[in-house]
């Protein structure tokens, strides 16, 4: 088919070849089957499997962490001892080259274990939905597998391949009972930021467990347990609490949602527990949650939120902070700090930027904001010399050099470098779309999506600090 030069001044266009990507993938699969240009041999269960590193890296975060950089260039044979089974790995390798995943009730658990090991979250979700659809309509109680799948590397390297987001799963597909001893939690350098992290990670976990109690009845779930003793005390400095999703918890998820009651989940007075679980506790252990908290209650005290005995156990050091907020029970050392904190509840923002009109509830926030206009960047990275307006931005930047990703998703295990990124990611699982377009009624998961929509569809002038306003039509 020949092509002729377009006449001068003619409008150009972009033609999309819809079959091109599938043809390229098919050609790569043919090269793999014929052993052409394959540059790595994978030993899975003693069985050698030839593949291309580029394809493995593009599909799996695990292989990306192995082959990235110069160190991966010299890896010609990769053995996975104690890793996924061959019958679970082979379908995944075919999927990488064909985009078709073959599942059956007999192979789904092995494929699920292998996908978890290889950090292929979208495949994990597909396997989970398949298992749930296969067994729940029949009313069959699926016996959990005895052995958990091998754990993949916990810290993903910076810049790992983008994972498929797909459509958000319903919340019921991401609930599970924690089983067995909790795995050791990795050190969290930002665990001191407990208030923010509690509402993102712990609220998600306990609300899921609480929904199981509300929806089900019958004998207690044998797999469900929460850490006790020293494990519970360490929960305030750990970001995971041993809830890494595995094969066992995901299989129990598919079968216990409507048949088991996860009662007696906690027996330790120092532990935060969901309100839904308090009905199964003795009267002496029940407590009312502090105002503003729908998920957690203190098991240590019997009074309302003002009980100081329980709060001192959970938050040592409050004796040096005599000023307490009556709404959320936060404690402060100075009266001025309490007055400033109250603006969080009232929504008052008395401090205004004289340049752009942005308003803030604290003078320190206004001072930090003013550096945007002045160009001042007082915080410098000692590694690369980059400078930042806020010290929080510097701390987040340093993680790029260390490769740390301290914030794990409690549902799928994906780890993130920044807390705000985790918050946005969690909405994929919950289906939450909090950003609303008033003119057309559409909802969006991320603020950037709403701003782009307003600019493209309504001609809005968007600014993160000033309320959006719709401009006149063209």
From Swiss-Prot:
Family annotation (SUPFAM superfamilies): beta-beta-alpha zinc fingers, POZ domain
Biased composition (Basic and acidic residues): 162-172
Span list, region Disordered: 144-190, 210-249
Keyword Metal-binding set for record: yes
SMART domains, alphabetized: BTB (SM00225), ZnF_C2H2 (SM00355)
Segments forming domain BTB: 38-105
Annotated localization: Nucleus
Subunit annotation: Associates with BCL6 through the BTB domain.
Name of the protein described by the UniProt record: B-cell CLL/lymphoma 6 member B protein
């Amino acid at each position: 088919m020949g092509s002729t030069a377009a006449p001068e001044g003619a409008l150009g266009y972009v033609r999309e070849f819809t079959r091109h990507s599938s043809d390229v993938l098919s050609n790569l699969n043919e090269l793999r089957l014929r052993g052409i240009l394959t540059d790595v041999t994978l030993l899975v269960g003693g069985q050698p499997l030839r593949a291309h590193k580029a394809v493995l890296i593009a599909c799996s975060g695990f292989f990306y962490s192995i082959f990235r950089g110069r160190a991966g260039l010299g890896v010609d044979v990769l053995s996975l001892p104690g890793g996924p089974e061959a019958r679970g790995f082979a379908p995944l390798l075919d999927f990488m080259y064909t985009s078709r995943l073959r599942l059956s009730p007999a192979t789904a658990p092995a494929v699920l274990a292998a996908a978890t090991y290889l950090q292929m979250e979208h495949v994990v979700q597909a396997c989970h939905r398949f298992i749930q659809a296969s067994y729940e309509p029949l009313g069959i109680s699926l016996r959990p597998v005895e052995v958990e799948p091998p754990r993949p590397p916990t810290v993903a390297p910076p810049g790992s391949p983008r994972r498929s987001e797909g459509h958000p799963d319903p919340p019921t597909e991401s609930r599970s009972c924690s089983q067995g001893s909790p795995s050791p939690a990795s050190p969290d350098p930002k665990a001191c930021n407990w208030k923010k992290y509690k509402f993102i990670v712990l609220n998600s976990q306990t609300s899921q467990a609480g929904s199981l109690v509300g929806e089900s009845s019958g004998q207690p779930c044998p797999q469900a347990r929460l850490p006790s003793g020293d494990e519970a005390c360490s929960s305030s400095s750990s970001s995971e609490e041993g809830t890494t999703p595995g094969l066992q918890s995901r299989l129990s998820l598919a079968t216990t949602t409507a048949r088991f009651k996860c009662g007696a989940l906690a027996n330790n007075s120092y532990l935060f527990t969901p309100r839904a679980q308090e009905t199964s506790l003795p009267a002496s252990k029940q407590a009312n949650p502090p105002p503003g908290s729908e998920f957690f209650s203190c098991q240590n005290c019997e009074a309302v939120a003002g009980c100081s005995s329980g709060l001192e156990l959970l938050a040592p050091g409050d004796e040096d902070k005599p000023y307490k907020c009556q709404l959320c029970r936060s404690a402060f050392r100075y009266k001025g700090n309490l007055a400033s904190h109250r603006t969080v509840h009232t929504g008052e923002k008395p401090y205004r930027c004289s340049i752009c009109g942005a308003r803030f509830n604290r003078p320190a926030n206004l001072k930090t904001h003013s550096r945007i206009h002045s160009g001042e960047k007082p915080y410098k990275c000692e590694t690369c010399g980059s400078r930042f307006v806020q010290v929080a931005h510097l701390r987040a930047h340093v993680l790029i050099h260390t490769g740390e990703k301290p914030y794990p998703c409690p549902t799928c295990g994906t780890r993130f470098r920044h807390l705000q990124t985790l918050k946005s990611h969690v909405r994929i699982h919950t289906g939450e779309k909090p950003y609303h377009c008033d003119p057309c009624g559409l909802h969006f998961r991320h603020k950037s999506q709403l701003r782009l929509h307003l600019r493209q569809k309504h001609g809005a002038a968007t600014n993160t600090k000033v309320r959006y306003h719709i401009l006149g039509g063209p």
